[in-house]
């Protein structure tokens, strides 16, 4: 089993999933992808990559609420045994009048992996509206926009001695800033908090996650706080 994200959760480094998929087939391994850090903001082609499973938390780039996620399962899992046992993932559970006829068989395909009470009347409509919005925005357009607003700020960071992965090997919606030895992470944190900038600190990286609600001025404000000028 090979399980990994489309991009690294700390600094946005992209993994070559096409080549990884090719290699997993050569050695007979399953490929399970965590799309939480990318799907919704970075295009993902299921037909091209053909993962055995793609799992996404709904609360990040899918713009949904906590407690919900989405998953795609390939043919390998069509007859699998789910982790969670409940009545609603059993065969014919949609026929409420016949629920007294207890079934031991699961629903076909991916339905067997649904959590109990998956017909959540509060959270599901929220996630559905979020997905409609993403389909209007389009992940490709999100990448193009975030690439445009981060280009100059990243150039300034690199010129000041900070490390950011080359754009060929990372997403534009998520990238990490790594510090030169001469810089103090504690001082940078103080400046960032003082300026009320929201970023994440993951290990020795400052994780930046711009979206359509940001602009270049937001990123330049961050650069000023990071560099200290």
Model feature map: region roles:
Residues 106-109, 120-165:
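Conserved PLP-dependent catalytic core of the aminotransferase class-I/II
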Residues 182-229:
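PLP-dependent enzyme catalytic core of the Aspartate aminotransferase-like
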Residues 95-113:
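The feature captures the short pre-catalytic strand/loop hairpin that immediately precedes
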Residues 31-32, 164, 199:
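Hydrophobic beta-strand scaffold residues
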